[in-house]
Amino acid sequence: MYKRQEYANTVKHFLISLCGNFDLAEDLTQETFYQAYKSAHRYNGNCKISVWLCQIAKHLYFDYLKKEKHKTTVGIEHLESFEAVNNQGNLEDTYLIKEETKELLSALRQVKHPYGQVFWLRAYEEMSFKEIGEIFDKSENWARVNYFRAKTKIRKVIEDENNENNM
């Protein structure tokens, strides 16, 4: 049971980073597991189950985009779902962590696909570059290069926002 929940969280967080919509990510997560159940006989074990599930989720999201042809964004009210805050910290630390999380999520939404998703998978889901490459049907080197490009782009977005706020 624990592994299933871990896989569900990985898929949901990946989809949130991909589509920016909490409700859509939940719907697509459910659809991902339904499709995985239907096609379990095709899982060949060449990659981790989490990678296979994220591949299914990615394809479902792109299918959704083809049908809907619209963009969405994450609402600030859903930030708590990322569980980025350590509940044992003091109130000031908790506030600072929440603010940093909001800032990072805002930056992730502003960088182009696939940079935000690659960054999320590496930094938060702790996937290897090989696994990230498999999700996007690309090489390990592609994932590595895009991760470092993502870090640069995210850093620039955050610096630009901080410079705007300090004016």
What are these regions (language model features)?
Residues 27-34, 47-59:
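Structural recognition of an alpha-helix C-terminal capping motif at a helix-to-coil junction
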